Amino acid sequence: MREQIEGSRAVAHTVARCRPEVICAYPISPQTHIVEELSRLVKTGELAPCEFVNVESEYAAMSVGIGASATGARTYTATASQGLLYMTEALYNASGLGLPIVMTVANRAIGAPINIWNDHGDSMSQRDSGWIQLYAEDNQEAVDLHVQAFRLAEELSLPVMVCMDGFVLTHAVEPIDVPEAGPVDAFLPPYEPRQVLDPDEPVSIGAMVGPEVFTEVRYLAHARQMRALELIPEVAAEFSAAFGRTAGGLVRPYRCEDAETIVVALGSVLGTIKDVVDELRDAGTRIGVLGVTSFRPFPLEEVRAALGHAARVVVLERALAVGIGGIVAANVRMALSGIHLHGYTVIAGLGGRAITKASLHRLFADAIADELEPLTFLDLDRALVERELHRGRTERRPGPSAENMMRDLGPTATGIG
């Protein structure tokens, strides 16, 4: 049913209609409204049978999720930022044990320095943890990806992260078609676990594995992800047929057919990029954008097919691999191995910095003129950086860089001026 609703609440109601049996979570902004609404639904009996487990930390949340899933319960949790990092050890256990947990990641920057706003640094840090990672462009897709995520997780015996931009999506109130229970039930059958701890049929899971088998175990994890490359578009097509709208899949090209310049991005920034692409197209510029929905597994063949004819590719990403640069860009380069074109990595929107149409127009103009550096930081205040570098060279104890630069900016740094 289409209604005016906050993104977080829409996700919560959609998760409820997927009929989880155990929800375990610890609140952290900007994920909090999701789990608050789910706890309310459990308390009022609107979501039943379901146990909501209040835990003392994010590590505990994932640990409880592992136990619940291992005993055959459909399991859900949500987190963000430092909470996701706190879960890291347990995340690897969940995927290594083949447990189909679904988790919402309300993407938020990671510290230090502390920052509560949006970028993709949190989920990108877990790209090799064995979880499927799906990135939503808007709140409608965030809702729809959760329905698909439970189906994917349970068919593949793999956990799935649905990543949605914190605050930009989680706290946005807009018209969203929240799926009704009946169609969700038809699309998502009752959970039948492939492995379960059962006292009547005792087994152990997570046993120690020696060198003679460990490589094969890891290969199977990779093989399941490769199977996901086939299943993700199949499930997306079934969803489209059942619900009458498109969501999910591996990648989504927009005006790429004859494009000389193609931008690659994930998440909510795609909407702004599409607006700029339309404006440039109206002016005669052959440009397009490729939205990546599935970052893990990464769709090498589909990315290569979409980008291989372009003269240049601009990868715009909201996370930074310190010491090398782009994360998404490294995967795109692998997809384009052997193809000669101009490639640019652009780090943008870190810590919630706005990515404006004006900035994108300037960026794309420089890219089309092949005047970009291979690694570019969008709207970087170079004077501010140079002052801090000079301070570090000339003072024995210059103080914390973040605080120094905030002082240099003055009242505008805190939004006072």
Question: Which residue stretches match the model-derived regions?
Answer:
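Glycine/aspartate-rich loop-and-adjacent alpha/beta segment that forms the canonical ThDP
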Residues: 86-87, 159, 165-195, 386-417
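Short helix-loop-beta junction
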Residues: 39-44, 234, 238, 275-289, ...
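Glycine-/acidic-rich phosphate or pyrophosphate-binding loops and their flanking alpha/beta elements
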Residues: 6-11, 238-261, 274
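Conserved thiamine diphosphate
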Residues: 117-166, 341-353
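Thiamine diphosphate
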Residues: 1-125, 130, 147, 392-406
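Redox- and metal-dependent alpha/beta enzyme cores, enriched for Fe-S-associated oxidoreductases
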Residues: 253-285, 298-305
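Peripheral docking tails and interdomain loops at the edges
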Residues: 317-417
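Conformationally flexible catalytic loops at phosphate/diphosphate-handling active centers
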Residues: 46, 50, 160-252
